[in-house]
Amino acid sequence: MALDTTIAQYEAPEKDLYEVGEMPPMGYVPKQMYAWAIRRERHGDPDTAMLQEVVDVPELDSQDVLVLVMAAGVNYNGVWAALGVPISPFDGHKQPYHIAGSDAAGIVWAVGDRVTRWKVGDEVVIHCNQDDGDDEECNGGDPMYSPSQRIWGYETPDGSFSQFTRVQSQQLMPRPKHLTWEEAACYTLTLATAYRMLFGHEPHDLKPGQNVLVWGASGGLGSYAIQLINTAGANAIGVISDESKRQFVMDLGAKGVLNRKDFNCWGQLPTVNTPEYAIWFTEARKFGKAIWEITGKGVNVDMVFEHPGESTFPVSTFVAKKGGMVVICAGTTGFNLTFDVRYMWMHQKRLQGSHFAHLKQASAANKLMLERRLDPCMSEVFTWADLPEAHMKMMRNQHKPGNMSVLVQAPTTGLRTLEDALEAGR
């Protein structure tokens, strides 16, 4: 195989299986690899559901690319995959094991016969949207509406928690060279998701000067929402649950921060016109007035950036302005959403579901990272052996503000090139 002469040259033996962190010869594909696998009979907490196994390296179709994973990102869909809740990934792909992981930074290691944009040795980040590419939505519409749309590493069995991962060539984007491998691995899923939520739903796409309420402002999604809102010339009002996170969110560019523990209007909406509803309504108005202290008296938010779901949705639909939008991408506190529909129809508010992003949106978000206009907000890095524990921390909401990464083939933190990794691995 002819390799780019700019790629680092090094000697390494050809083997059927390499230890984690051991580098094969450039472009050489072993028969097997290590992976953190989930099996249906092990569904449960991540520390028991995810076990290291030796599995076959996936074979490529003509438009596929094999990527050597240097580092992988940790997201809540890894917790869902382990638990098998709200659905088991095995109900979709029918494979005997599931490799989770929907974020990664790595090196192109092999390409399918029809791949022309990428070559062996290219350093890339991976966005997690896949589709078959052969329907109207994929060709002139919105690929996220395609019947074949699926999330790599959650709805497919071959995610990033392995030494090699198989992806579609359209999933690849250039890796920001100023970031370390672990920083580059942690941002794509949450950043692209936040980008589509804010800019992908016309005519309610974010505009300069608008106000946006951001739940979970110190987390992976929220930290990018705050930065994107600030970059767009709009105003972010962040919501936190721990006072220690206030300065972190302000430093990201928030106009103001609210601590939800100062209010008592969370959970499912009480039945309207009951004493319980009256108590809820008083607290919800108190929360709304706290927003006014940031935006100005009587100025409600143009958009609510929702992802907790059940615990916050009644308030989200209440505080959005007339003609405003509540955009939601998840339900981390529960899926049974309730709200007072009177404030929805009388004030003509929009409820908008949002799911990841298509390539153009993911690429636009990645460009901001390439241009150093965003911070990856990486909070913690875990070793390969501690991957299940990283998911346990996320499940228990014990993780630090920002985004988490796991080292895979990168032997240590702080490395930015293949040469760095080779030197550190000696």
Where are these regions (language model features)?
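C-terminal hydrophobic helical "lid"/dimerization subdomain
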Residues: A2-K31, P314-T317, L359-R426
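Glycine-rich phosphate-binding loop and adjacent beta-alpha segment
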Residues: A232, I240, V249-M250, L269-N273, ...
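Hydrophobic/small residue at the entry helix of a nucleotide-binding pocket
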Residues: T193, G220-L221, S311
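NAD(P)H dinucleotide-binding glycine-rich loop of Rossmann-like/cofactor-binding domains
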Residues: V54, W80, S102, Q130-G216, ...
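Adenosine-nucleotide cofactor-binding segment
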Residues: V214, N230-S311
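Glycine-rich beta-strand-centered segment in the early N-terminal region that forms part
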Residues: D56-V74, P86-N139, Q171, P176-H178
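N-terminal Rossmann NAD(P)H-binding glycine-rich loop of SDR-like oxidoreductase domains
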Residues: S218, I226
